[in-house]
Every structure is written in structure tokens, then in C-alpha cells.
Amino acid sequence: MKTNYEFRPQYLKDFIGKEQLKNNLKVYLTASKRLENSFDHTLLHGLSGTGKTTLALIIANEMNVNCHITQGNLLNKPIDIINLLSLIKENDVVFIDEIHACGLGAFETLYSVLEDFCIDINIGKDFNSKMTRLKIPHFTLIGATTIFGKIPKSLEERFGHIFHLNEYEPSEISAIILKNNQMHFQIDLNEEEIDLIANNAKGIPRLANRLLKRVVDFKINGFNDIKNIFKKIQIYEFGLDEQDINYLNVLYRQDNEIGLKSIAQILRLDQYTIETKIEPYLIQHHFINKNLRGRKITIEGIDFLKNNQLIK
């Protein structure tokens, strides 16, 4: 089975969707290459699975440089930043996924690095210590985050480019599915089936690729009806999954609003997962209302459960 990496486009011309973002990136990349400069520091924010890592790798490929990848929660102290940057060469890309999770010491070290491409470090102890300035090759920092509000203002101001990646249009998701099926599987899928997969992907390319792989698995085993396949893997109308349905049923059983803490206890899920993975899509489809008193299912949410016979 193909990995997520193999589904990723390697160059901007192969990236499907987000036309305005692509057109702007093409301008910025062309200018950087002609001026022989490193690409400006870039912040990508948006939902998981919308192409932030893919775009970081594309920028590195377009600039013909290496991409060094790490996670924000691994960078807590100045020494973590020093160790990371000790590996880079001139104009390389450093990609920090979930950059909001960096520690305070790492953030403070990044501030001077991003502007001056140097780090001031203490060598020695006590009265014998002295400050030494360590020069860093010019590089491009690309940060990705699903929580834009947690990015410190001082860090945000140091990015030359800030791009928001939201959900993709259904036609864009359909094009992604069509291309990946042709390139990797060549399974018989008609236009209606491709659109059905796309309409259940919540506008997220990563989810679309996951659904495509599951459809391929079942079709290879003789299951040809897409709707039946989705029932077997518990994917419901609009792409809602079992967690979404369980959440809606918790609210359906309440006469009044219910708080996030209580929902988390009933579902045995952490509050962060509920707030970031479940609720945004349900709010978008007007299935729930959220206010200071808590959460409440809407008429649309109740109709969805009843029409799909999903009341538990």
C-alpha cells in the first residue's frame, strides 16, 4: 500500500487546488531564485491534512535545497535550536511542524536567529564564562501550526509569508482523488464514485487519500458499491465518522446545553480533541450550537441522526 509520502506532490505544478496561494508562491519562489536569496521565512496555519508539510517540501524542492524536519514539542531549550541548526547548509529549509508547541527558550533563541542569522551562547561557567556569537547559514524557517492563536506575536512578525490553508473545494478533492488513483492504483472509479468519496472527505486531502485507500482495499476484495463500503468503515453522510456520531448522540440525549468537560467524560476523549477535531465541522454544518452555557444539538443535527437512523 502506498504511504502518505508517496501521495505528496513534489513540485508546485503538481499541487492541486489553492490556486491563488500557488500563484503567489510561484512569484515568490521565482524572485528568490533569481536574486539567489533564501526563501523568506514562512508560516503555514490551518487544519490538519490540508497540505502544510507538503508545501514545505515543495518549497525546498523548488529551491533545490535540503529540508530538515522536526516537531515543535522537541524544541524546548536554546540548545535544541543550536543542535537543529548545526546541520543546515546555506539556503536550506528548516520545517518545524506544530511550531506553537516550542518551549519559551526555543522561541527566544529563534527570534535573533531569524533576523540576524546568529546565536549568542555562553561558553564556560561562572566568572570564566564569556559570550560568543555563533554565525548560522542563511536558511528558510517554515513553521506549521493548527493553532495560529498560540504563535507568539514576536515570532509571527518575523515571518515574511503567512498562508492560511482551509478546507478544499469538492472539485479540488475530486481532482486529487482522480490523480492519485490513476498514478497509484488504477482501480475502476467513475466520476460519480470519485465525487462521492470527495463529498465525504470533509474538504481535507489527507482524509480523501485515506478514504481512497480504503475503497481500493474493498474493491480489490470484490466490494464495488461505494455507499456499502462507507457503511462498513463507519463513514456516514458528509463524511461524519463514529466519533462525530457519538458526540451528536450525547447532545441529543440532553434537554439543555451540556459543558465540554461533561462531554469529554462521557465520550472518554480529551477536551482538545473535541474542540479541534470534532466540533468545528459540526458547527460548519449547523449540527450543533456552542455558547457560554455549553453545547446543544440543532434541529439540523437531530434531522441528520434521524434521517440516517443513527440515534443510539
Curated annotation (Swiss-Prot):
Localization annotation: Cytoplasm
Gene Ontology terms: cellular component: cytoplasm; Holliday junction resolvase complex
One protein family per Pfam: AAA_lid_4
Its EC number(s): 3.6.4.-
SMART domains: AAA
InterPro entries the UniProt entry points to: AAA+_ATPase, AAA_lid_4, DNA_helicase_Holl-junc_RuvB, P-loop_NTPase, RuvB-like_N, RuvB_C, WH-like_DNA-bd_sf, WH_DNA-bd_sf
Assembly and binders: Homohexamer. Forms an RuvA(8)-RuvB(12)-Holliday junction (HJ) complex. HJ DNA is sandwiched between 2 RuvA tetramers; dsDNA enters through RuvA and exits via RuvB. An RuvB hexamer assembles on each DNA strand where it exits the tetramer. Each RuvB hexamer is contacted by two RuvA subunits (via domain III) on 2 adjacent RuvB subunits; this complex drives branch migration. In the full resolvosome a probable DNA-RuvA(4)-RuvB(12)-RuvC(2) complex forms which resolves the HJ.
Protein's name in the database: Holliday junction branch migration complex subunit RuvB
Organism: Ureaplasma parvum serovar 3 (strain ATCC 700970)
